[in-house]
Design a protein with these regions (language model features):
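Conserved anion-binding
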Residues: 107-172
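Structural preference for beta-strand elements that scaffold enzyme active sites
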Residues: 2-6, 43-46, 73-77, 99-101, ...
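Glycine-rich, proline-tolerant flexible connector loops at the mouths of alpha/beta enzymes
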Residues: 38-74, 168-172
Length: 172
């Protein structure tokens, strides 16, 4: 891995203002938050549109084009449980400054996200969990191995294109 990467995580529908802006296709709040994160040193911006069951593909395309069009093709992490929306975002993504990130795969219900990243020459964030958070490091390693093997089956460069998140819990 060549460098430390900072991913800005403030473009998420979990924030009421962002949810409203995405729903209404209001660019100003989104652009303002994006600029704040980039000014603070973010390398990538995470675009979390939530499940977006009704209009996910259109919304993700709109968000990708908005952000890359206003911020010189800023690299993005596409974050949603809607696979069609991630595919749509990748279809309009400009790779001039970096590959898209598929956020995120796990060793259970989202293993297909590794396949999606591999098929689109994208990076994948791979959460070292399955049905829940791993109870110990051995379980984390088991999940990581499952994800890594899946990526290798598709010819992914595991060192460059699979970013593992061990999901460590806070120690009290």
């Amino acid at each position: 891995m060549a460098k430390f990467v900072t991913i800005g995580e403030r473009l998420s529908t979990t924030a009421p203002a962002v949810n409203k802006a995405f729903s209404e296709r209001d660019p100003e709040p989104i652009l303002k938050r994006a600029k704040q994160q980039l000014d603070a040193g973010a390398t990538y911006l995470d675009v979390n549109i939530g499940p977006a069951e009704n209009d996910g593909p259109e919304l993700m395309k709109w968000a990708v084009e908005l952000l890359q069009g206003n911020f010189d093709n800023v690299p993005l992490a596409l974050d949603t449980s809607n696979v069609a929306a991630i595919e749509a975002g990748i279809s309009v993504y400009n790779r001039a400054k970096g590959k898209p990130i598929v956020n995120s795969a796990d060793a259970s219900g989202r293993l297909e996200y590794v396949d999606l990243a591999a098929a689109n020459d994208a990076i994948v964030i791979a959460l070292c969990n399955g049905e829940g958070i791993a109870k110990d490091n051995d379980e984390r390693m088991m999940y990581m191995q499952t994800l890594m093997e899946r990526g290798m089956e598709h010819g992914m460069d595991v060192a460059e294109d699979m970013w593992f998140d061990p999901l460590f819990l806070v120690i009290k």
